[in-house]
Amino acid sequence: IVKDIPQLSLKGGAVQGTLVTPSAWLTETAAADPESSTEVWAKHLADHGYTVRAPRLPGHGTTWQEMNSTVWQDWYAEIERSFRELSKTCDKVFVMGLSMGGSLALRLAEEKGNGIAGLVLVNPAVHSERQDRHLLPFLRLVIPAFPGIVNDIKKTGQDEGGYPKIPLKAAYSLTHLWAAVKADITKVDQPLLIFRSTDDHVVEPSNTAWILANVASKDAEEVVLHDSYHVATMDNDAETIYDGSADFVERILAERS
């Protein structure tokens, strides 16, 4: 477990910024591993001249026990703080996120409106179809954690740095984030790009389908990834995501110039 790693902040030459939000339960959020999904994604965007922040969220990059002492409002507060910091120096801010990071990105878009120029989501989650999900409110009171799915990556030799267990109190709080996102989803009207893996063992495809069916975005696109699992930003389709994200930002900026 990697501890006490600062957030990643990269200064580009442009006055546009990108906020990259991470998945849950992952030490990748600490940007400790040069091959981590957050860092590589962020550096790719910085190479295109954008100022990038990839914040380390409370409870991330430490231990699952510490994660279990946090709630979704703690994670969101850090995302919001990073957004405010970017907005001080950047005329336009794009928000990108993987898995739970996608949930947080959607919530930020709902609350910040036209303060966000566009969204890029990778295998975003707004609900779960697990049969045991209805037991979570009760299980969290008696069991601290369940075994988790770690390294859902098709490409060999990759390590996302995930926690070996899912902290149940934090997972229960995540369901409240999903509820908040779903309640206000029609407020999302920014340009939207979603990358979805066809073979994802963590987030069901119904999540992306629901998001696209309910957002108010007139500019919304889904890109299907055929050679990656859940952590697609570290998988065989990573370059598709990196290049597609940069192209998306460039297109939106050109259309608004």
Mark where each language-model region is.
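Short, surface-exposed "cap/lid" segments of acyl-processing enzymes
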Residues: 1, 17-57, 63
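Catalytic nucleophile-loop/oxyanion-hole region of alpha/beta-hydrolase
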Residues: 63-89, 94
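Gly/Ala-rich beta-loop-alpha elbow adjacent to hydrolase catalytic centers
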Residues: 97-101, 105
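Active-site nucleophile loop of the alpha/beta-hydrolase fold
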Residues: 120-129
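Short beta-strand/loop motif that positions the catalytic acidic residue
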Residues: 188, 194-196, 200
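Conserved alpha/beta-hydrolase "acid-adjacent" motif
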Residues: 201-207
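Catalytic histidine neighborhood in serine/cysteine hydrolases
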Residues: 215-231
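Catalytic active-site module of serine/aspartate enzymes centered on a nucleophile-bearing elbow/loop
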Residues: 227-257
